[in-house]
Amino acid sequence: MAQEIVWYGAGAGAFFVSAVVFVWFAATRGNIRSSFYYLPPIHTSVAGAAYVAMALIAGGQLGDTVSITTLRFADWIVSTPIITYYLARLAGVDTQTRRLAVAANVVMIGVGYGFVSMSGSLRWIAFAVSTVAFIGLLYLYIKTFARKINAATASVRSLFQSLRDLTVVTWSLYPVVYFLGPLGTGIIQAPDLNFLVAVLDTIAKVGFMSILLVRYNSVETFVDSWSVAPAK
């Protein structure tokens, strides 16, 4: 349990530090009124708050009021659609497509919670439905978004591809980890699953922020050309 407290605490620290750095970046070099700038620190702050609560639960300070798993999925159902919406905005897709992508994301997480909270055949039905929603989301990322962003500048396309590829790779590992975990085949035990999920969360979210900060030229191009006039 002490190890889990360290993992959750380290994750929370990484999320909050990345949020603060990005807010500073937005205040000094960007436009905090643009969704391009205010969404990234929101999504890592949500994750940071969830990880603080997880650390407190693991340490016994919050008792059994809520489970770590419930907190984790509550974080994901808020923070992951922000990433999806962000990628959709960056790609410049229309409003209907953005809503479809966000809806698929919410279904993926919401039904995925059924996998960890139900039992028997219902658990595997939930896993299958969540996986189908994820595959649909991947199609939007890889095909629909990619077709639309072909009209953007080379720097914006490169930025989108980096963020999308990071998201696709990390998110694809979550169902594998859960399938191999205690609720699936049992190859991965609960403490190891919690560690792996914490690592994936950190890579997915802090990595997303890091790419944005490093790729400042691409960010600047995007803000100048698209963020002031959102796609309709």
Curated annotation (Swiss-Prot):
Residues that bear N6-(retinylidene)lysine: 205
Q: What is its main location?
A: membrane
Cystine residue pairs: none
Single biological process term from Gene Ontology: phototransduction
- SUPFAM superfamilies linked to this entry: Family A G protein-coupled receptor-like
Q: Which InterPro entries match?
A: Arc/bac/fun_rhodopsins
* Alphabetized Pfam families for the sequence: Bac_rhodopsin
Subcellular compartments: Membrane
Q: What is this protein called?
A: Sensory rhodopsin III
- Highest classification ranks of the organism: Archaea, Methanobacteriati, Methanobacteriota, Stenosarchaea group, Halobacteria
Query: What's the name of its gene?
Result: xop2
